[in-house]
Amino acid sequence: MKIWLSGIYEFFLRYKNTWAEVWKIRKELDHPNRKKDESEFLPAHLDLIETPVSKKPRLIAYLIMLFLVVAIVLASVSKVEIVATAPGKLTFSGRSKEIKPIENAIVQEIFVKDGQFVEKGQLLVSLTALGSDADIKKTMASLSLAKLENYRYQTLLTAIEKESLPVIDLSRTEFKDSSEEDRLRIKHLIEEQYTTWQKQKTQKTLAYKRKEAEKQTIFAYVRKYEGATRIEQEKFKDFKALYKQKSLSKHELLAQENKLIEAQNELAVYRSKLNELENDLLNVKEELELITQFFKSDVLEKLKQHIENERQLRLELEKNNQRRQASMIRAPVSGTVQQLKIHTIGGVVTTAETLMIIVPEDDVLEATALVPNKDIGFVAAGQEVIIKVETFPYTRYGYLTGRIKHISPDAIEQPNVGLVFNATIAIDRKNLTSPDGRKIDLSSGMTITAEIKTGERSVMSYLLSPLEESVTESLRER
């Protein structure tokens, strides 16, 4: 090992000594300085050897190396923005209010024009729903008739309770919409029904009185034959005692017994008739009560039906009035009328057709962008956004700036694009500046391109990423 180290030492020492000796005589080894004209008369091989090399190529090489070093340093230090590009449009934060009819209707009158400012509640369009006027008239007529019917049965109910017909007053305010013919008809029906009920009661009352008179007559016969039976009974006892004393013949005893039996039979017959009449009286009295009960029950049932019918008709009238009210379309908010689509009086509009759009006056202009699925993982609320309006070239009119306000949590399907996420962008201003210095106001619906700053990366990383990707993928095995 020592021999090896000694050999290496001697080797470097020899070169060191040689370099030192050459360094001492270095000036003697240089060629003498000659002028340019002296060098030109030297032989060619001496001219080539002694003429100094031009410094320009060396300087260019140094400059190239310096440029490469500076470029590498700048590429490593400098940062570029990572941008996700998303198409979209300008909108208002409160969402413009679309004005639509609730059903098919005819345009009766238009009160606004495109670009007009309207206040909340201001009438915009007057429509006539197909068949609404006829429905209202029909319902009002049915309701007036239902009120009369209710009054009819309420009056009859009062008459039943008081046993007398009250004054029929059909001139009250609630009946003002009823025709004179209907009022007279209801009055006649009330009087006719009350009279019929009274006649039925009178007939049953007379029948009851007749039965009562018959009862009194039969009762008198019963009393008569009860007395006759007692007398004949006493006679029979006396005849029987005389017969036992042999003071009376058997034929006379049998004759008296026959009279007693006849009196008893007559008494039984009249008592049976009396019981029958008492049952008849109970039946007649019950029928008399049932006449009133049935009549009252029928009146109450009809009154209940007509009260329910009136309630349903009131609801129907309210619904029809709401239909009429809905056909008078008013502004839901204060704002500006845009995209007015109806201009013809008498024209027909269909259900859910957009008639116009109201842009709220205090609305804030925003942008909505559709972020591609491949970029959504890097987009977050609060990130800076540059918005370029397609209508105005950004190189001449500039661009808008803003920040991500909200990102939808769920993707939506877009034709020819696939799944995208809707992002709302709050912008700093709602106008651009033209080359001549004029302010240009922007409006909802303008197409934009949003460039969302998702981060930064070095230029070197940007330049090497394709190479890195190629190398990484090329080293994979199938």
Curated annotation (Swiss-Prot):
Residue spans, topological domain Periplasmic: 81-478
* UniProt cross-references to Pfam families, sorted A to Z: HlyD_3
Q: List the transmembrane segments.
A: 60-80
Report which superkingdom the organism of origin falls in.
Bacteria
Q: How does it sit in the membrane?
A: Single-pass membrane protein
Keyword Transmembrane helix found: yes
Per its UniProt record, what Gene3D superfamilies does this chain match? 2.40.30.170
Matching InterPro entries, A to Z?
MFP, Secretion_HlyD_CS, T1SS_HlyD
Q: Which residues lie on this side of the membrane: Cytoplasmic?
A: 1-59
Q: Name one GO biological process term.
A: killing of cells of another organism
Q: Which GO terms describe its cellular component?
A: plasma membrane
Q: Where is the protein found, in the record's own terms? A: Cell inner membrane
UniProtKB keywords: Cell inner membrane, Cell membrane, Cytolysis, Hemolysis, Membrane, Transmembrane, Transmembrane helix, Transport
What family classification does the UniProt entry report for this protein?
Belongs to the membrane fusion protein (MFP) (TC 8.A.1) family.
The entry's function note states: Involved in the transport of the Leukotoxin.
Q: What is this protein called?
A: Leukotoxin secretion protein D
Annotated organism of origin:
Mannheimia haemolytica (Pasteurella haemolytica)
